[in-house]
Amino acid sequence: YLHRRHEAGDEILFEGAQGTHIDIDHGNYPFVTSSNPTAGAASVGSGLGVTTVGDGEVVGIVKAYLSRVGEGPLPTELDGDADEEALADDIREKGGEFGTVTGRPRRIGWLDLPMLRHAARVSGFTGVAVNHVDVLAGLDDLKVCTGYQLDGEEIDTVPTTTERWERCEPVFETLDTWESFDSAAVAEGGYDALPEAAREYLEFVADEIDTPIYAVGVGPDREETVELTNPFDE
């Protein structure tokens, strides 16, 4: 069926779940799932050849901060003191960061660009959609991890072993914060309706990972999305 649709010239969308860093081959083993949540699984799972699937767009989905379920390295985790834990609680509540089935609170951290660079490289992102930008509104401080310190050396992507990753210390860049905004109004007004500091945040991320922003989630509803590039457009 998929081969016929492709040969007829139809567009086909494959949607993955979970995340790069719990990929059984490319994640931080043994803190992984049993499958491949990376883009290569689209070919294996669908039966379409890699040259067919690889000829299209690959849009990475990322939150404006970091969350994780379960164990494993998380260098930017907000758990160092009472203030960090309070901030993590605030982000967790605003972002609904609880397990869908178990209700277990997810671990929260600042956006980790080394992790995002690794994800972009492994899956070959042509663009990213950044969600939960509204959740970071109203913070007193805003940080992004741009690299790690490991054994006296600064690196810009995740190391090759989990043991080395566990020893990494984050290198942070502090960015301007933005005030809360009306999600529906921003979705209607488009990208320029976002607060200036939010746009600067997104552009900083895009520059750091050398990947353009395709869409921005500014609220919890599907309609509260700002589209910059539609991969289905010719």
Regions found by a protein language model. Give the residues of each.
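Non-transmembrane, aqueous-exposed alpha-helical and coiled segments at domain scale
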Residues: 1-234
